[in-house]
């Protein structure tokens, strides 16, 4: 059954992570988010105060180690903690994809655990860059990384930053990730979801949250 506009909006993190974003852009994002009825907005750590100050009762998410994941774990943890202290209720962190490809799952777990320990009760989503793992390794690697995220205390696994050259979310990746975590964690599909059909396909594959930058266009596409 096709969700209503309001039902689809409730899955959405309305996202603005472009480096050129200003405080005014973030305020406009929050206003639009309130109008559309989305679940949350997602902004970079320096923009969290602007999102909170914009008010409207909109939940705020932020990121850590974004977009490369090539940060010392302590730096990711501190960045995440600062975002939470500024008012973020959720953190989307990026793993070290190179460590995952090298089979260093202990390192991946430790990296995630460092951020988990720094954010208290905030929701922690772990970005695994699923397209990169599938292109440069295999399905088993993606599954193992998702299970490592679960072991380390993640609340969600997330497909993509949307900035990696390998691409964004895919139905195949979402289905694999949903199977890997078996309903114990949420699955966020993000990156390249531009139409209502894209969004519905991700939900059908097992996504429980959607990261969208063109939210209005997606919702309008429901007809």
Curated annotation (Swiss-Prot):
<feature type="active site" description="Proton donor/acceptor">
    <location>
        <position position="188"/>
    </location>
</feature>
<comment type="pathway">
    <text>Carbohydrate degradation; 2-deoxy-D-ribose 1-phosphate degradation; D-glyceraldehyde 3-phosphate and acetaldehyde from 2-deoxy-alpha-D-ribose 1-phosphate: step 2/2.</text>
</comment>
<protein>
    <recommendedName>
        <fullName>Deoxyribose-phosphate aldolase</fullName>
        <ecNumber>4.1.2.4</ecNumber>
    </recommendedName>
</protein>
<dbReference type="Pfam" id="PF01791">
    <property type="entry name" value="DeoC"/>
</dbReference>
<feature type="active site" description="Schiff-base intermediate with acetaldehyde">
    <location>
        <position position="158"/>
    </location>
</feature>
<dbReference type="InterPro" id="IPR028581">
    <property type="entry name" value="DeoC_typeI"/>
</dbReference>
<comment type="function">
    <text>Catalyzes a reversible aldol reaction between acetaldehyde and D-glyceraldehyde 3-phosphate to generate 2-deoxy-D-ribose 5-phosphate.</text>
</comment>
<dbReference type="InterPro" id="IPR011343">
    <property type="entry name" value="DeoC"/>
</dbReference>
<dbReference type="InterPro" id="IPR002915">
    <property type="entry name" value="DeoC/FbaB/LacD_aldolase"/>
</dbReference>
<dbReference type="InterPro" id="IPR013785">
    <property type="entry name" value="Aldolase_TIM"/>
</dbReference>
<dbReference type="GO" id="GO:0005737">
    <property type="term" value="C:cytoplasm"/>
</dbReference>
<keyword id="KW-0456">Lyase</keyword>
<dbReference type="GO" id="GO:0016052">
    <property type="term" value="P:carbohydrate catabolic process"/>
</dbReference>
<dbReference type="GO" id="GO:0009264">
    <property type="term" value="P:deoxyribonucleotide catabolic process"/>
</dbReference>
<comment type="similarity">
    <text>Belongs to the DeoC/FbaB aldolase family. DeoC type 1 subfamily.</text>
</comment>
<dbReference type="GO" id="GO:0006018">
    <property type="term" value="P:2-deoxyribose 1-phosphate catabolic process"/>
</dbReference>
<dbReference type="GO" id="GO:0004139">
    <property type="term" value="F:deoxyribose-phosphate aldolase activity"/>
</dbReference>
<feature type="active site" description="Proton donor/acceptor">
    <location>
        <position position="92"/>
    </location>
</feature>
<keyword id="KW-0963">Cytoplasm</keyword>
<keyword id="KW-0704">Schiff base</keyword>
